[in-house]
């Protein structure tokens, strides 16, 4: 048994003998499931999907080469098939038609080929290459940084607990620190080892990597000429707030920051705020005010936004080149990165554990001592008990002063009981403090008890597949941006329309004489959608994308051509 839809028997026999790989050959087909996914192929290739070849060695034998597997994974994720296991429930022959094959790899075969890629351990290098290419083409100097926790519910790994804001709980997991642009498009991410804080990761990994990727975008001569010019600007939330940290970034790297200010006590006069018209998805008005401020000896700019309720949201920055309105816009655009995390969780299942197994952590890594933390927790609970007893004692003393003489005896007895318990609490408190004093606050991993010693999940395969998911997201965004131009208002429905295109059947017609692969998309749900997709076909065809492994140029068409109307879609 070769398998369902395995029609190219001779090729498979030759591949099994190591004589040849699969040939990419398209047949004329009508109404192919998920045919619309090929509309995203030009953007997948433009975003570097096949640039993996610069870092990964190709397979020497086997029916499927790495190109077919990478394309299979990309199409799989775009079709919202979130794991290799789920492929078992989809027609392998229909998916194979999209790749010019008889069928896609069986789940076990696909896992094996992914493992062949993963053991080469080149995901970080590939991601670095892609990041540099994207940054060069997008020409941005604003980078958004935030952590995303991948919650772990298993028992194999001992992971430190992280605060998961979306669940408002501290749970075991691994934290990924992502770098995105102002539109939410991701560049790269770094996985923390244990419980690293955002400040630490920016200093040790994210800032050095961004400096390397942006090397030369701002020359040293420009920096020397203009003392206020930053290399680039980082935008993050209050987690990394620290004026001394901001000074370190500026003095050591010439990196500016934009973030929310913590512990704002005062209010500015509302008469100082001016109205600014802001054009986002809809035109809105912001009431802003800017003043210079000095915090812990660090001079910064503070911009506040006045809301309708009278609340003043404070934003601070060390960037003196941006206008007031841009500072506010960049800070309040952080929601694009949050939306990216939510979309990737829901649509691409980015938190899924892909590779089982654990790796050891560098034994010299310093972590918070669990014994110290346990004693601190005991001390906190004990002090809470003592505070409650002191409050009750105070109430009894007050009652005794104001009460009647007949109740004084009973009242004093109760007071005595509370005083005795408080004394016991104080004695226990001193004992815990003495025990905690003997424990160091931080210890190295190798000094942790073996049964609770931290380790980490294997990440190479997940990193590889996350890169493909990032490219898929960027391809989706690119076609969504094209569609937005043909609508009166940009809306969240654009993403739904892109999904609708992907899920729509299409006809495939190869012409090997002219080296053209024509894809004709079936009708979408509404004339408005048909008109929009028909309008962007020429733009997509201008990319002149050639299907990988062939000389066939992709030509995209729609089956329904809606006549132009006066009204705007």
Feature map (PLM): residue ranges:
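Short acidic, glycine/serine/threonine-rich loops at helix termini
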Residues: 99, 153-158, 244-248, 269-272, ...
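C-terminal, active-site-flanking charged/polar segments
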Residues: 256, 323, 331-367, 422-425, ...
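Charged, amphipathic alpha-helical linkers/stalks
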Residues: 343-401
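Extended alpha-helical coiled-coil "stalk/arm" regions
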Residues: 389-440
